Amino acid sequence: MLEFKHKNTFFLFNFKQPKAQQACFFRSSFWKKQARILGSAQGRGVTWFLQTKDLFGVNAALKHYYRGGLWGKINRDYYRFSTLSNARSFAEFSLLKQLHEAGLAVPKPLGACVEKVAFGFYRADLLTEKIEHAQDLTVYLQQGKLTEQDWHKVGQLIHQLHSLQVCHTDLNAHNILVQQRDDGRKFWLIDFDKCAHQLGERWKSENLNRLHRSFMKEVTRMKIQFSEQDWQALLAGYQA
């Protein structure tokens, strides 16, 4: 782990030895100048996919934190600063590191930065591993079906997360990736912003219900191939 401050910006990296121009790693313009942009994905903001295997051993995804909802139209990306560990990017980095080291299929965190701005606010960015040959599960389900064994895998993945007492507060069908591999399909969980450890058991069934509602919503909205039989297969994997 490498942690340092440069001017008004705090940096955290998942490596020990400093790298050239590392303070520039959270600027998309830096990667564009080096012709390292592999592509992008549009969500609340743009996530940039970067060619970084020579630097990190894996390609990377760079995201800037943006606010959503009505408040996001007034204040796009400023957050009230309390402590560095509670800043959005540092908190997500820390949780991802714990989950990755526990063997959960989540992107490896590569770096985080927090830029303090005026009046006690900050802006934040996160670098994570790019999951290769993967796509949003809902996009996949627009084109084809998963097998019963695949749904078991999804359920097992969520159970593994819950067994670590971690609640994914935005557990939905879009935050599951399906990766095509030579040995079959592998499933990943992404987007752990604002997620945290949680005590007790009741929240786990509520979390699963949230996911079920998400699938049902996309049956109507995106015409994905998903049935109650698929959901029961997911639950069987979760309970196995």
Swiss-Prot record:
EC number: 2.7.1.166
A Gene Ontology biological process term: lipopolysaccharide core region biosynthetic process
Source species, domain of life: Bacteria
Subcellular location: Cell inner membrane
Main location: membrane
InterPro entries: KDO_kinase, Kinase-like_dom_sf
Keywords annotated in UniProt: ATP-binding, Cell inner membrane, Cell membrane, Kinase, Lipopolysaccharide biosynthesis, Membrane, Nucleotide-binding, Transferase
Keyword set includes Transferase: yes
Membrane-topology descriptor: Peripheral membrane protein
Pathway: Bacterial outer membrane biogenesis; LPS core biosynthesis
Keyword Transport: no
Active site: 170
GO MF terms held by the record: ATP binding; kinase activity; phosphotransferase activity, alcohol group as acceptor
GO cellular component, one term: plasma membrane
General function of this protein: Catalyzes the ATP-dependent phosphorylation of the 3-deoxy-D-manno-octulosonic acid (Kdo) residue in Kdo-lipid IV(A) at the 4-OH position.
HAMAP family, per database record: KDO_kinase
Record-linked NCBIfam families: PRK01723.1
Record-given protein name: 3-deoxy-D-manno-octulosonic acid kinase
Source species of the chain: Pasteurella multocida (strain Pm70)
Originating gene: kdkA
